């Protein structure tokens, strides 16, 4: 039995001695006590021990705080170390780092473009200070059981509502009459951005006035308000008050105000504002004229639904008498026949994304396309995030021993999770820098592709930077959380043994993520192929007219003599085959239908809504239309002034099997005799069905002097040498037009312009599909590389046993092809459903053939095989001696 010192002495020592010195002091005293017991006996040794204990109660040993005491640091104390380790790991694994950072950078760049685009779309018209109280009046009208959704409303409606409805604070109207020839002392230009506006426009919309009095600017006679850029363009300065501009040769106007350029994020775009009250339509003030768009500024706190509820009173009080006066019918009879007249309000801030009506002041976007853009951007970011997760977990075997050593050294799981999250955040931060760089360099190309005017300053302002950092942090946590939890879960013994590899063939999370990535890629490929197929169908479909080799010369506001002489002189050129003067072309229909009745009928149920186009006798021949029955107009034949050529749709709706010689009449008494029927031709987008159209002669085509409504002269070339033909036309124009600018376009280009939105969608889909496939393939490339590295000893053994290179490549590839095949199976029905919905917007469309899905599938498999094979072949060609030398 060992002899021990006095317990009381030990307690006294523990009480006085500093904890960080106790072990050392007590150990020394116990050794000394054992020695003294042997030397002088137990009794004397105990007294000596007490003496030594009392002797150690000195200032150096008495209880006090340690100056070098080490305590377990908090997780946040290790941040610097974690980021340093993360940076070293990224530097040591340059291939892995490049794949993950580049993939994330692409995903972040696409998502940034998506956010910029969506934010820009939702910002439309919000710069107006009273935007939340401004509403536009929409019209829903049906005649002949054909509905018309218009952005315009009756000419007197705004003024009437302001007078009769106390909820309306102010009203203003805007109107557009096409292009105008504008001339100053220095230049003459045909301008498209001319709007007519009431003087109250400044009270409703936020227009920053640089010079002039906004309350009087449009109230003065022969006035014009111009923008800052127009002022510099025509006068070289913004000091343009009282300067003179001449519109259409003889309309002299004085500048009464200069305003700042209207922001691009406005559905109302104008360079010139002219007084609307001076127009003939405004002076006529007819309730049957839907020429202008009307905007209401409601009083604060007004419920727009309450205003809409009062529109029935407007219909009964004003519209019903107009119907009786001009159409010999009543509102009740119109509704009884199945037709309708309705008015509604749409908030100003919703017009750009939620309105697609006749008479829109500018082309609007669709909220469906905006959401689609946002969703695709999000999906591509998810593909990049899943890449990071896959590549990080695939490297688990390499990090396993590191995890094991850290756990043995005392690291907790929370500390390991924090370390791996730090690495993820650092990777994401580098990816953000690269992504922002991509946005900077690619923004001009994106603006061209998306028809936008986005600026890089929107990315780097303070609020955007904060959102970017917060978003990047979220993406970093999202991407790094699962790998961090997965890697930190390894048991030290298993981790140090390196037995943590999961084979790719197992249905692990990595397989599901690959399936998700390629499902989105296949979906985008199928969408791109089908959109491309529909666009090719539009370009190659027989339209009922020949759009090639036809040039359009804008002659609006030209005199009758000028137009007639110009056409006659141009036709002398051997480069020109034929020409026509017209107000309407198959790409610029008015879409406004008049009510026409067969023979002597007056019943609204038998009426036909038909457009009336004024043309000359050469119209049908110049546009290459096919005359199915009857004859064409004859130049100089006065009787043809009371005739009409209709299309097949009109003949069908009138119920005429043999329409030639039949008569039709319009409400009000105008009667025309049908002399011919042309084959149906498309005059609108293929989204719409072909409706009735009637071609009638203008008075000037017969040598009359009633004035003309012609805006264009179109010529068909005799030669393929377009430049020679255009030069000939331009020479003649300069001789006759007396200084007016020569502006032209091609009929084929005007036709293509109707599908610009679809063309942009096609291009965006192609870009998105390419980016999605690239990111997915980066991940697949990394996974196949890690798989080949982990199985190098297995490959070596197989080669020693006689396996061929082809067999090994097949072995390594098949496990990765399974998720791709599953992705094709999942994506195909989803793509079929989505594209069916999209194609429903077209009245004339392609069938979704099976080969489109087959091509998308084979393309995906081919790309995946090509990506995997690079690493598989490389691994299969390695000398087995190198892979087995450590065994």
Regions found by a protein language model. Name each.
Residues 1-91, 881-885:
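Negatively charged linear elements and acidic catalytic determinants
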Residues 76, 92-117, 365-401, 429, ...:
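Hydrophobic alpha-helical transmembrane segments of multi-pass inner-membrane transport and secretion
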Residues 66-98, 359-362, 392-429, 440-560, ...:
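Alpha-helical transmembrane segments of integral membrane proteins
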Residues 198-210, 224-365, 565-757:
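Mid-to-C-terminal secondary-structure elements
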Residues 122-131, 140-142, 270-281, 323, ...:
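Short juxtamembrane loops and helix-capping segments at transmembrane helix boundaries
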Residues 384-426, 779-817, 871-874, 878-879:
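Interfacial "coupling" helices/loops that link adjacent transmembrane helices in transporter permeases
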Residues 113, 344, 425-492, 533, ...:
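Small-residue-rich transmembrane alpha-helices
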Residues 121, 135-193, 200, 232-237, ...:
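Hydrophobic, regular-secondary-structure patches
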């Amino acid at each position: 039995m060992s002899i021990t010192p006095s317990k009381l002495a030990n307690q006294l020592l523990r009480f006085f001695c500093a904890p960080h010195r106790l072990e050392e002091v007590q150990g020394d005293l116990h050794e000394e006590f054992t020695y003294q017991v042997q030397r002088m006996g137990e009794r004397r040794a105990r007294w000596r021990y007490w003496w030594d204990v009392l002797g150690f109660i000195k200032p150096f040993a008495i209880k006090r705080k340690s100056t070098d005491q080490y305590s377990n640091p908090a997780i946040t104390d290790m941040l610097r170390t974690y980021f340093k380790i993360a940076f070293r790991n990224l530097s040591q694994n340059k291939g892995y780092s490049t794949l993950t950072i580049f993939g994330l950078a692409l995903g972040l760049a696409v998502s940034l473009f998506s956010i910029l685009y969506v934010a820009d779309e939702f910002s439309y018209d919000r710069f107006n200070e009273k935007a939340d109280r401004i509403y536009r009046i929409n019209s829903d009208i049906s005649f002949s059981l054909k509905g018309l959704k218009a952005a315009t409303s009756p000419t007197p409606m705004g003024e009437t509502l302001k007078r009769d409805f106390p909820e309306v604070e102010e009203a203003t109207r805007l109107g557009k009459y096409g292009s105008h020839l504008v001339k100053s002392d220095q230049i003459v230009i045909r301008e498209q951005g001319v709007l007519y506006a009431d003087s109250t426009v400044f009270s409703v919309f936020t227009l920053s006035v640089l010079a002039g009095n906004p309350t009087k600017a449009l109230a003065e006679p022969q006035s014009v308000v111009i923008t800052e850029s127009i002022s510099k363009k025509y006068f070289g300065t913004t000091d343009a008050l009282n300067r003179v501009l001449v519109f259409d040769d003889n309309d002299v106007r004085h500048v009464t105000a200069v305003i700042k350029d209207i922001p691009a994020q406005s559905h109302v775009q104008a360079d010139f504002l002219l007084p609307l009250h001076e127009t003939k339509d405004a002076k006529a003030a007819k309730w049957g004229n839907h020429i202008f768009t009307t905007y209401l500024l409601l009083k604060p706190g007004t419920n727009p639904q309450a205003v809409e509820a009062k529109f029935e009173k407007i219909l009964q009080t004003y519209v019903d008498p107009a119907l009786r006066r001009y159409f010999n019918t009543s509102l009740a009879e119109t509704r009884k026949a199945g037709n309708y007249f309705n008015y509604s309000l749409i908030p100003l801030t919703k017009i750009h994304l939620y309105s697609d009506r006749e008479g829109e002041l500018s082309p609007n976007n669709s909220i469906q396309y905006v959401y689609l853009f946002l969703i695709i951007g999000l999906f591509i970011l998810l593909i990049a995030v899943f890449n990071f997760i896959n590549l990080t977990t695939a490297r688990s075997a390499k990090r396993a021993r590191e995890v094991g050593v850290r756990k043995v050294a005392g690291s907790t799981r929370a500390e390991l999770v924090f370390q791996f999250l730090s690495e993820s955040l650092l990777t994401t931060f580098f990816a953000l820098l690269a992504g922002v760089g991509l946005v900077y360099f690619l923004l001009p190309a994106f603006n061209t592709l998306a028809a936008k005017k986005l600026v890089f300053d929107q990315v780097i302002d303070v609020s955007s930077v904060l959102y970017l950092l917060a978003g990047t942090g979220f993406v970093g946590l999202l991407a790094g959380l699962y790998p961090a939890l997965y890697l930190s879960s390894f048991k030290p013994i298993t981790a140090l043994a390196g037995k943590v590899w999961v084979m790719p063939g197992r249905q692990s999370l990595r397989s599901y993520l690959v399936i998700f990535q390629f499902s989105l890629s296949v979906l985008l490929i199928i969408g791109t192929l089908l959109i491309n197929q529909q666009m090719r169908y539009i370009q190659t479909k027989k339209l009922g007219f020949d759009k090639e080799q036809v040039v359009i010369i804008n002659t609006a506001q030209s005199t009758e003599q000028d137009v007639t002489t110009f056409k006659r002189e141009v036709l002398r050129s051997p480069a020109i085959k034929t020409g026509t003067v017209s107000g309407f072309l198959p790409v610029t229909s008015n879409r406004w239908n008049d009510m026409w009745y067969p023979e002597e009928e007056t019943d609204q149920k038998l009426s036909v809504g038909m457009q009336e186009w004024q043309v000359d006798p050469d119209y049908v021949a110049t546009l290459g239309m096919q005359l199915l029955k009857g004859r064409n107009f004859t130049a100089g034949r006065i009787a043809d002034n009371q005739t009409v050529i209709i299309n097949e749709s009109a003949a069908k709706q009138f119920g005429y099997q043999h329409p030639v010689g039949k008569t039709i009449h319009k409400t009000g008494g105008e009667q025309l005799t049908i002399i011919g029927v042309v084959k149906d031709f498309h005059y609108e987008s293929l989204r719409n069905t072909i409706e009735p159209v009637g071609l009638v002669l203008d008075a000037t085509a017969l040598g009359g002097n009633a004035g003309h409504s012609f805006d264009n002269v179109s010529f068909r070339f005799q030669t393929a040498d377009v430049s020679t033909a255009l030069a000939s036309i331009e020479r003649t124009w300069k001789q006759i037009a007396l200084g007016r600018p020569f502006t032209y376009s091609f009929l084929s280009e005007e036709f293509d312009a109707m599908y610009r939105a679809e063309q942009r969608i096609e291009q965006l889909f192609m870009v998105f599909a390419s980016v999605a496939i690239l990111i997915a393939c980066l991940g697949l490339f990394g996974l196949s590389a890690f798989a080949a590295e982990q199985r190098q000893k297995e490959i070596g053994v197989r080669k020693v046993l006689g396996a061929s290179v082809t067999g090994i490549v097949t072995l390594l590839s098949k496990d990765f092809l399974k998720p791709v095949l599953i992705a094709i199976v999942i994506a195909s029905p989803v793509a079929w459903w989505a594209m069916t919905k999209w194609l429903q917007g077209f009245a004339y469309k392609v069938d979704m053939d099976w080969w489109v899905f087959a091509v998308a599938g084979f393309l995906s498999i081919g790309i995946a095989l090509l990506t995997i094979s690079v690493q598989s072949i490389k691994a299969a060609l390695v000398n087995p001696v190198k892979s087995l030398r450590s065994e």
